Amino acid sequence: NNYCKIKCLKGGVHTACKYGSLKPNCGNKVVVSYGLTKQEKQDILKEHNDFRQKIARGLETRGNPGPQPPAKNMKNLVWNDELAYVAQVWANQCQYGHDTCRDIAKYQVGQNVALTGSTAAKYDDPVKLVKMWEDEVKDYNPKKKFSGNNFLKTGHYTQMVWANTKEVGCGSIKFIQEKWHKHYLVCNYGPSGNFQNEELYQTK
């Protein structure tokens, strides 16, 4: 497993080395299903790109304060199966939060995670989870750089629209914990966004 040779900037053992397979490792949680269908992958990618283009065209009115300025260097993301594989390995641990080492050979990798739960036996569509990241824009102050904003409140939004990020790949798992039906989505992004003192994108 070549992932064991990858040295991440933040240290730690690579997720795909540490866990080594797509076998879910969820303790006493009952795994219902894992992985994304081809359609779900397309829908997640489209949602990212529609949102990036909305920002680029200056159509996002939300913010603290809004609106968000238009962008001149916002390109569409493409799906990357390797990013998706590493994201799926992490999702299959059923641990909400970020893993430590997820980089791939060609670049550093960023990450967004979302978890929803319901006592009804239904699971939110993955696009709904992506929209939760978009909604963080309401707390984003475009007059400040990335580090001037509250990372905990806006970090998923900023990674979604980071202009230098080119690729995305996601993994998903649905499980039951006590009486909660949970859907956990992990998206990995390359090259990573969210660097201190950098702009999300070039404004027009």
UniProtKB/Swiss-Prot annotation:
SS bonds (residue pairs): C4-C17, C8-C101, C26-C94, C170-C187
One Pfam assignment: CAP
SUPFAM superfamilies noted in UniProt: PR-1-like
InterPro entries given in the database record: Allrgn_V5/Tpx1_CS (IPR018244), CAP_dom (IPR014044), CAP_sf (IPR035940), CRISP-related (IPR001283), V5_allergen-like (IPR002413)
Coiled coil region boundaries: none
Origin: domain of life: Eukaryota
Expression (tissue specificity): Expressed by the venom gland.
GO cellular component, one term: extracellular region
Primary role: May have an ancestral function in the promotion of ovum fertilization by sperm.
Family: Belongs to the CRISP family. Venom allergen 5-like subfamily.
PANTHER family hit by this protein: CYSTEINE-RICH SECRETORY PROTEIN-RELATED
Protein name (record): Venom allergen 5
Species: Vespula flavopilosa (Downy yellowjacket)
